[in-house]
């Protein structure tokens, strides 16, 4: 295998597939894995190199599959493990690589780990899989990204932490048993032949020792803002050794397996620390997605991206859309900031200019492809 094949992820065009809405093979109104398999030839004809599958693992579906109840099985909504294997084999026969979503910050509250923790009671080893704390009130001032306190109390009086929905308890990544369990999950999918992982919210996995209050109560439930100190629930240094071990696992498999982190950290020089040679292969460059559609802003983002990622020998990714924001054909048809782009446009909101948005989206896509090629020539 030559170096270009080994470094495929540096220049690959990766197409995101949202399984529930992509293609329905059995007519039940829900997209599924056989539906994806049936469309792989069409995707190949677009000139893409790989697909990334949004969550398809077993889940109660309270958060579109980002609440996983079994990391080593397929949700019946989408098919079976056999369907996955057939899809993977078909993709590989067409020369397409397959990356899958991995959600390590939290599980579903229906995962066996959490159900065993609840049943075992306070002080048990099972509860060490998560962040449980005693108290009459929430253990700190952290707020959920979905609203309200980031803590929910059980009938036995203990509280558990969830940076997202209360049905998504956060795992305790200081626990070696959690780390070992996820290393086994990585191997399960790598053994099946997947080419890598898109890792969801890796910057949320570590928590500051002692789970201290956020210093700014007004910001205790918000994400990161450039220029602010790192909050105690995001961007902890303790996660980096975990990802180095994951990288070593991927590197132990034949061919080049890759992982891309959804690490929304700024400035770009900070984001680049996640793609040092022994950690993630890539991370999503959301600065490019957020950049206003002006030559000045786009050039500034590109220059800063080349500088930051080049300093650690990594390529930048160039992202225009994903499942969390409006598609760029709509977004570029109006003056939409990131908040609107994430929340969408309602029927009573100012509507995008469809013709303008499509023209800009085509231009942006062609421009992005050329940036990718230029990155590989650097």
Stretches found by the model and what they are:
Residues 1-378:
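Active-site and adjacent substrate-binding regions of carbohydrate-active enzymes
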């Amino acid at each position: 295998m030559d170096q270009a094949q080994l470094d495929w992820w540096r220049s690959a065009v990766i197409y995101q597939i949202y399984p529930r809405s992509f293609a329905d093979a059995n007519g039940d109104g829900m997209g599924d894995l056989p539906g994806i398999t049936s469309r792989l030839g069409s995707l190949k004809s677009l000139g893409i190199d790989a697909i990334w599958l949004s969550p398809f693992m077993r889940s109660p579906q309270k958060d579109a599959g980002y609440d996983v109840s079994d990391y080593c099985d397929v949700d019946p909504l989408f098919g079976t493990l056999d369907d996955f294997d057939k899809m993977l084999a078909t993709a590989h026969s067409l020369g397409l690589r397959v990356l899958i979503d991995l959600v390590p910050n939290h599980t579903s509250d229906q995962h066996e780990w959490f159900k065993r923790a609840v049943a075992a009671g306070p002080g048990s080893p099972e509860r060490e899989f998560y962040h449980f704390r005693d108290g009459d009130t929430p253990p700190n001032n952290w707020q959920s990204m979905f609203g309200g306190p980031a803590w929910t109390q059980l009938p036995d009086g203990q509280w558990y932490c969830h940076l997202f929905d209360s049905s998504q308890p956060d795992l305790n990544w200081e626990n070696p048993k959690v780390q070992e369990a996820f290393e086994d999950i990585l191997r399960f999918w790598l053994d099946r032949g997947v080419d890598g992982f898109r890792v969801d919210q890796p910057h949320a996995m570590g928590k500051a020792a002692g789970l201290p209050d956020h210093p700014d109560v007004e910001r205790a439930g918000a994400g990161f803002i450039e220029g602010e100190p790192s909050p105690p629930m995001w961007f902890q240094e303790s996660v980096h050794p975990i990802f180095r071990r994951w990288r070593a696992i991927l590197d132990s498999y034949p061919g080049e397996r890759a992982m891309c982190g959804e690490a929304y950290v700024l400035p770009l020089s900070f984001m680049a620390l996640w793609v040092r040679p022994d950690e993630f292969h890539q991370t999503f460059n959301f600065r490019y997605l957020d950049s206003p559609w002006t030559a000045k802003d786009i050039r500034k983002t590109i220059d800063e991206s080349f500088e930051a990622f080049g300093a650690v020998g990594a390529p930048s990714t160039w992202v225009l859309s994903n499942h969390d924001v409006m598609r760029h054909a709509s977004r570029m048809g109006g003056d939409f900031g990131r908040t609107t782009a994430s929340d969408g446009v309602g029927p009573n909101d100012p509507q995008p200019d469809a013709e303008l948005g499509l023209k800009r989206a085509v231009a942006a896509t062609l421009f992005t492809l050329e940036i990718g090629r230029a990155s590989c020539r650097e």
